Amino acid sequence: VGSSTDEWAANVPAEWIEQVLDYCDGFDNRYLFQSKNPARFLEYLDHPVMKKSVLCTTIETNRFYPDIMRNAPLSRERAIAMQEIANYGIPTYVTCEPLMKFDLKELVELVGMCSPQQVNIGRNSRYDITLPEPTANEVKMLKAELEKFTKVEIKANAYCWMR
């Protein structure tokens, strides 16, 4: 739900979120809400629409790149919030996009904390920004480790890593 914005960002008024959730609840649909601030989801876990929703966060690396990620909560904070959501019984997904240089064991641990039903892996799609990207072999190792506990989807823009 939503596009070009993070509906769950700290600066989004609670009334706006409540209006969106109430509106969505009026339809017999399944929803996917995604945020880099999943701790905000925790405030709404008892909203009726959550019974027919999947909650997703982005964990693009376990590392912190201050020039790139300055406004987003740390990856570990996101994973902790998603762990609480999963423990509450709400299905979760993780998107690793744009996937950046990572430490394999640490990233797998963070993603695993989220208990995701699916992980999507994608590359940077903004050509005006250069990001620290992993090698193809590193991504293949990540995919293999993640597949030990969840479904992994490789987005079309990341197929080059799978060759």
Language model features: what each stretch is:
Residues 137-163:
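C-terminal accessory extensions appended to soluble enzyme cores
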